[in-house]
Amino acid sequence: MSEEIREVKVLEKPWVEKYRPQRLDDIVGQEHIVKRLKHYVKTGSMPHLLFAGPPGVGKCLTGDTKVIANGQLFELGELVEKLSGGRFGPTPVKGLKVLGIDEDGKLREFEVQYVYKDRTDRLIKIKTQLGRELKVTPYHPLLVNRENGEIKWIKAEELKPGDKLAIPSFLPLITGENPLAEWLGYFMGSGYAYPSNSVITFTNEDPLIRQRFMELTEKLFPDAKIRERIHADGTPEVYVVSRKAWSLVNSISLTLIPREGWKGIRSFLRAYSDCNGRIESDAIVLSTDNNDMAQQIAYALASFGIIAKMDGEDVIISGSDNIERFLNEIGFSTQSKLKEAQKLIRKTNVRSDGLKINYELISYVKDRLRLNVNDKRNLSYRNAKELSWELMKEIYYRLEELERLKKVLSEPILIDWNEVAKKSDEVIEKAKIRAEKLLEYIKGERKPSFKEYIEIAKVLGINVERTIEAMKIFAKRYSSYAEIGRKLGTWNFNVKTILESDTVDNVEILEKIRKIELELIEEILSDGKLKEGIAYLIFLFQNELYWDEITEVKELRGDFIIYDLHVPGYHNFIAGNMPTVVHNTTAALALARELFGENWRHNFLELNASDERGINVIREKVKEFARTKPIGGASFKIIFLDEADALTQDAQQALRRTMEMFSSNVRFILSCNYSSKIIEPIQSRCAIFRFRPLRDEDIAKRLRYIAENEGLELTEEGLQAILYIAEGDMRRAINILQAAAALDKKITDENVFMVASRARPEDIREMMLLALKGNFLKAREKLREILLKQGLSGEDVLVQMHKEVFNLPIEEPKKVLLADKIGEYNFRLVEGANEIIQLEALLAQFTLIGKK
């Protein structure tokens, strides 16, 4: 077996999965937890479990998938093969940017961290109404709009016809004019180059188009000899003899839009449409010679916000909005086609963007905040977008008002008479109350009038009138007298009477109402479903997406090469034959295998709460699994909920009830990074296991085992570099090892720091020491070397500076000052300041501190 083939085999599967512990004995560095879990296996019973600890991939497409990278259109396989050198597994990259969407559905450009190549024996093929076709791995998430209006990431294997796939409504490509691009559009639409003798012909019935082609030819190719003739059958033709023009067209592929065409894509599309565009009864149709060209034209049209449909080799533009945009942005040179197309704007229906609206969620927001916007049940997407804007304006006002009311109602209105006694002289003067009368109030021998109570409270800094006014506003706008009355244990008319009366007898009850209303405000402001609804409305108004209905979902079996681009943070990018938005747990599995043996899969359900956070997951998936009895003689089933701290408060409450309901035959294992985010009623029902970061020696032992098994040479320097970066995280350590192995079978510290996008710690320390010793310019030079040559971000450098500052040979007070400065400048970077300027300013601070 050759080295090249052997290396491909080594890297064809993520090692973090390949070397995942299968049994409890395989788990490294958590002996205190393994011991307790083994006891559960031995006894055959266990309580609900909560795994808490610090945070520890595969989403792939086929190689023929189109992707826009650095402003150009590539095939994904071609791009990854070029960047990875054909290697399987992850390959770190720098300077590669792709288009994706942010949390509000707006198009943005994102950095790619690494490219990935792998094999699979199973794919999901997806077709849509507009002619899109995607082939992705079964677990690849796609952004989908479901029948009930939900918008969420769904794994490909769970998609079904009728779901709506997110596609960008436009692509921010260069859309300018260019005479060469226009000439190429004409040539590729109606031109022909003879195999020899430098002859090019151009055939078109329209004399104006032939004239334009000849003008462009004369302008672009000075050596051209041009003549026009009419054949005996009446066919008009332009003959061009030009070595330069002939060489150009023979150097490009005629099945794709050439690079020169993309540089002036508006000009190219107009010329191509003049030649190959036709007007049908309800659409403009652009004919092509092959599917690849049709796909590229669809991408090009998307850059103008024109959503096209593919039908074989035809690109179809339909709907008034699309046709009008096409005519405004691209158009036809010929008046006859232009007039025909303009008639379609009046004939065709207004385009619907196809989004199913989540009326239930919108209604919840309206009811929760008592919004006054008129409801329209049969909303089109466009009307829903307008409604969301109206709602958002009202919501911002209401939330702002609720915060103001909360601030006012946070202050008690009961007077502390001991405090009045201390300030009696001031009260007598400002409240204008006689001394003997005030003394009786302080002793409780008589009560002040309500007016006097208000004046006394003012002296103590209590604004009773403002608080009562806030209570009235909340009761009328956000609650009801009936709701407050139920909580108070009285009738609603009593609440109204109390709030509007002016007797001091009601002050104690007013204080109770204040507390009730404050509690209700806090419930509203912390309502998870309300926040979800507001986020949905923001998305509805701001998103730059169109929704294409899925018509077919089919499973494919075979041996497939697949590719991925890893985009940290947002985990999605624009790809597909037409632009589409595509995306980017150990102890529980080991315990399930030990408990259930071969039947573990039948008795084990795994869910990721960060993907499936809503209350419906608890009500549907969990309950459906929990209702059935365990298989194979097991006494209970296991439901493993990863990233449980991502569940909403409502979902956690539903989970608590489900845990109680099915406690006889189901045990829950909840895994989270922060147990504090799990509600107390759930924590009290679980045995809690706190996973600690692994010791370096435990990680080192596992890495040496993997390296030996994979035929790698793991140097001591390389091992120490991995341990330094991993910081007790085994998953991170294994991923770094695999990424470094993609570069070389010898794992050195140089390769490790390269793939992990980290600077050497000694380089960071040297830079800081240079600054502290007063050598600012050399420190600045070292900083620029780290940033520019090693390609690190400013935040990466700051994180390492913070880690290394405590290892510097300086006095402790200076370390405190430096750590404080690093924190300050990190905040500046997070706020969006220029990283080079801020880091150089930080080094200047180091220099000043070093002189003290």
Curated annotation (Swiss-Prot):
Keywords: ATP-binding, Autocatalytic cleavage, DNA replication, Nucleotide-binding, Protein splicing. One of its GO terms (biological process) is DNA repair. Residues 183-306 form the DOD-type homing endonuclease domain. GO terms for cellular component: DNA replication factor C complex. InterPro entries: ATPase_AAA_core, DNA_pol3_clamp-load_cplx_C, DNA_Rep/Repair_Clamp_Loader, Hint_dom_C, Hint_dom_N, Hint_dom_sf, Homing_endonucl, INTEIN. Changing residue 831 to A: Decreases the stability of the PCNA-RFC complex and reduces the clamp-loading activity. GO terms for molecular function: ATP binding; ATP hydrolysis activity; DNA binding; DNA clamp loader activity; endonuclease activity. The intein interrupts the potential ATP-binding site. Part of the RFC clamp loader complex which loads the PCNA sliding clamp onto DNA. The complex possesses DNA-dependent ATPase activity which is further stimulated by PCNA. Belongs to the activator 1 small subunits family. RfcS subfamily. Heteromultimer composed of three to four small subunits (RfcS) and one to two large subunits (RfcL). NCBIfam families: intein_Cterm, intein_Nterm, PRK00440.1, PRK04132.1-2, PRK04132.1-4. PANTHER family: REPLICATION FACTOR C / DNA POLYMERASE III GAMMA-TAU SUBUNIT (PTHR11669), REPLICATION FACTOR C SUBUNIT 4 (PTHR11669:SF20). This is Replication factor C small subunit. It comes from Pyrococcus furiosus (strain ATCC 43587 / DSM 3638 / JCM 8422 / Vc1).
